[in-house]
Amino acid sequence: MAPARKGKAKEEQAVVSLGPQAKEGELIFGVAHIFASFNDTFVHITDISGRETIVRVTGGMKVKADRDESSPYAAMLAAQDVADRCKQLGINALHIKLRATGGTRTKTPGPGAQSALRALARAGMKIGRIEDVTPIPSDCTRRKGGRRGRRL
């Protein structure tokens, strides 16, 4: 057995490709699930089927103060992080599914929804379809607050 020489060993590196294989200029779509409540904003990217999570960042991961988790600034930082990760993986276009809390609670998206969507577009991601997927009750349990409502 011959002794190994220093600095002479040949290392073969396998080319590792993350994400789908695509031609130049071809759009590779993912789905951006943006959940904007009045307490936090989630930006969650999945593959086109929605089964495989690619990246998920929240507003609370980007700011220190609890009161700032749902702010437009935190949502913008989260969306920029998500866009960078998507570009690394080869995803260059997104379908948007925007969601508010819904159900018996508010059906209005929180303050971070619009800024997260705008930050994704400004980061160079192509936007496909935008859909509101807030859960709307057809007929459901009684809303919190009692018969006479919330008294201030």
Curated annotation (Swiss-Prot):
GO BP: any one term: ribosomal small subunit assembly
One of the record's GO cellular component terms: small-subunit processome
Signal peptide: none
Keywords for this protein: Cytoplasm, Nucleus, Ribonucleoprotein, Ribosomal protein
GO terms of molecular function: structural constituent of ribosome
Compartments in which it is found: Cytoplasm; Nucleus, Nucleolus
Pfam family, any one: Ribosomal_S11
Stretches that traverse the bilayer: none
Family affiliation: Belongs to the universal ribosomal protein uS11 family.
Assembly mode: Component of the small ribosomal subunit. Part of the small subunit (SSU) processome, composed of more than 70 proteins and the RNA chaperone small nucleolar RNA (snoRNA) U3.
Summary of the function given for this chain in its UniProt record: Component of the small ribosomal subunit. The ribosome is a large ribonucleoprotein complex responsible for the synthesis of proteins in the cell. Part of the small subunit (SSU) processome, first precursor of the small eukaryotic ribosomal subunit. During the assembly of the SSU processome in the nucleolus, many ribosome biogenesis factors, an RNA chaperone and ribosomal proteins associate with the nascent pre-rRNA and work in concert to generate RNA folding, modifications, rearrangements and cleavage as well as targeted degradation of pre-ribosomal RNA by the RNA exosome.
Name recorded for this polypeptide: Small ribosomal subunit protein uS11
Gene symbol of the encoding locus: rps-14
